[in-house]
């Protein structure tokens, strides 16, 4: 199922405006495909309606985008320049592009992965 659901709103006043949007599903199958001393390869399932994906890493007390995949067919990414024997946290979400606007789905559960010694 590509979408969780549809929603709409009508704003009435001096003029009436309508708004319609779809809520994307979260990304499924998010996991570590492989680990090395200085890198982690992450993978996920292709979203049926996704235009791309946003991958974030938790660094310095905040979430930082490390990858924005602009192709819906991209289902893996290797995060490099990591420290050996260290745990890292990641999360991902899909987005759908409508014209110049990106509509984001919900974030995945946080994935914690440790690099090798």
Task: Explain the meaning of each model-derived region.
Residues 27, 44, 55, 79, ...:
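An aromatic-rich alpha-helical recognition segment common to small helix-rich domains
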Residues 79-99:
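Beta-strand-rich modules
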């Amino acid at each position: 199922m590509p979408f969780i659901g549809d929603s709409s709103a009508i704003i009435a006043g001096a003029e009436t405006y309508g708004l319609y949007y779809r809520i994307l599903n979260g990304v499924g199958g998010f996991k570590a495909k492989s680990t090395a001393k200085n890198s982690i390869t992450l993978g996920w399932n292709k979203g049926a309606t996704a235009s791309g994906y946003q991958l974030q890493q938790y660094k310095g007390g905040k979430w930082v985008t490390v990858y924005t995949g602009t192709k819906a067919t991209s289902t893996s990414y290797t995060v490099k320049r990591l420290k050996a024997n260290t745990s890292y946290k990641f999360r991902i979400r899909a987005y759908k592009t409508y014209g110049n606007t990106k509509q984001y789905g919900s974030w995945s559960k946080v994935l914690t992965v440790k690099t090798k010694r």
